[in-house]
Amino acid sequence: MAYRDQPLGELALSIPRASALFRQYDMDYCCGGKQTLARAAARHDVDIDIIEAQLAQLAEQPIEKDWRAVPLADIIDHIVVRYHDRHREQLPELILQATKVERVHADKPNVPRGLTKYLTALHEELSSHMMKEEQILFPMIKQGMGRQATGPISVMESEHDEAGELVDVIKHVTKNVTPPPEACTTWKAMYNGINEMIDDLMEHISLENNVLFPRALAGE
């Protein structure tokens, strides 16, 4: 099956572990979920035939859960517990680790300078964002008022883009979250945590941008 003309967001939802494959190629399937596979492959200089073959292999496996068929209230409850609560745990710990690494290894050429600042900015951005979703947007959707939520959804999508831009800066500062040979245990653990946080955030944004918001706006 040809996947090249399909949007990344749709592929991430319909093919098991496609999201992990896109992350491997640094393809944005959440905020950039509307771009086709062909366009994303061209932007990242990826052989379209190779990634299509990889997707075909993944597609042979049964999908764990098709969120496109799950009631919106259940999706919202899942987002809050699986992603919002998790981000609230992840980011303060990562900020503490980054503060320590930047202080202890200040003289190392590969130290991720500015990482604490950017993680703090992401934490503040997401804290405000998630609170607005939980207090304003999610209750509207649960009450069947999704069609009236065009404004709040537009704001949330814009804030998703801003969070994505901060993640890009964090990836740049950390050399794509790759620890240097001299990295200590804390440094390596922090990078593992950052990778996990980015994976979670991309899944989180994809579920909202590509499933929850379109279905809410359609009046479900």
Swiss-Prot record:
Gene Ontology cellular component terms for the protein in this record: cytosol
The entry's keywords: Cytoplasm, Iron, Metal-binding, Stress response
Source organism, top-level taxon: Bacteria
Function in brief: Di-iron-containing protein involved in the repair of iron-sulfur clusters damaged by oxidative and nitrosative stress conditions.
Membership in a protein family: Belongs to the RIC family. YtfE subfamily.
SUBUNIT field: Homodimer.
PANTHER family for the chain: IRON-SULFUR CLUSTER REPAIR PROTEIN YTFE (PTHR36438:SF1)
Entry protein name: Iron-sulfur cluster repair protein YtfE
Native species: Salmonella typhimurium (strain LT2 / SGSC1412 / ATCC 700720)
